[in-house]
Amino acid sequence: MFGGINPNNSKVSMGGSTRHENDAWFKKFNDKNINLINISPQKVDAPSGSSWLPIVPGTDTAFMLGIAYELETKDLVDRNFLKNYTVGYEKFKLYLTGQKDGQPKNAEWAEKICGISAETIRSIAVKISQERTLITVAWSLQRAQNGEQPYWMATTLASMLGQIGLPGGGIGFGYGAIGGVGNPIKNFGGLTFPKGKNPISDFIPVARIAEMLNSPGSNYEFNGEERVYPDIKLIYWCGGNPFHHHQDLNRLIKAWEKPDTIISNDWCWNTLAKRSDIVLPCTTSLERNDIMMTPRDPYVVSMSKLVDPYGQAKNDFEIFKGIAKKMGVEA
């Protein structure tokens, strides 16, 4: 488990959680004596019964490369799976074995970076090749420079084992998060309003907001493509707070001064509101009638208004409708 599966965090979900089933699933794991390895800087990032491998933050890819090197050089790789279900392994192998850059990504190389002993890396490589193995990567690993690499490497490692698609094997991202990723729950579609088609196809990865604001017009790579950062003059932010989840907040605070105008919908005087030129006060869930649907539970919950909206606060849909009317594009 890269990044672990924190039992406390798994009880929290946007939109709420009703069943709270993860503890029961963790217990089933322990009852079956399944070996859980928590690879994380924090020991608490895993359910009870897990073994802990403390790792230097941000070095998960190096650790996985060390395992991959052992699998390749000890011929523990599922060659048939790689041949039939993947593309590009031979090019990856040139990098892994050092034929491309002169540096084999062996266990000793990985130990110097990630802090986990070469002996442990070799032992894990043999163990996961001999048993049914599920590799999980927490969502948190993406929130770093080159944050996509652990996910690419974990997928590569799972492909080398050849267990993708087998019961209890393969690869999983975000297991245990938001109340049940990975649990066998049948969801149904949510209630939505009709929406038009966005004529703008450009986008940036969410973790590059500060970089975009600081470097308009510069190039960046994403999923093998070269893109260009736009020159943003106005930000209108609703339904979230970039100062809650963005990395390097001091850098973001300085970058946030670049645009000419910043507008936000918010219900409290938080960091985003304090750094906005215009704040449109919106209601909380206690000030409107609504419907709640949890993302991982098959439930619809009726939400009855408890109090009238405070002051001039309006719900987000009323705000959007009012703006659309002023712009002459109200549906």
PLM regions and their residue ranges:
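Hydrophobic alpha-helical scaffolding
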Residues: 15, 53-58, 82, 100, ...
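Long, well-ordered, tryptophan-enriched scaffold segments
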Residues: 30-37, 42-130, 326
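Short acidic (Asp/Glu) and glycine-rich catalytic loops that position anionic groups and cofactors
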Residues: 44-48, 100-106, 131-137, 231-233, ...
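Extended redox/cofactor-interaction regions of prokaryotic respiratory oxidoreductases
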Residues: 1-39, 61-65, 159-274, 284-291, ...
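Acidic/polar loop patches that form or flank catalytic/metal-binding clefts of enzymes
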Residues: 77-79, 121, 135-136, 163-173, ...
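Active-site phosphate/pyrophosphate-binding segments
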Residues: 88-214
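Catalytic, metal-anchored helix/loop core of enzyme active sites in primary metabolism
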Residues: 277
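Glycine/threonine-rich phosphate-binding loop and adjacent beta-strand/alpha-helix elements that clamp
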Residues: 286-309, 320, 324, 329
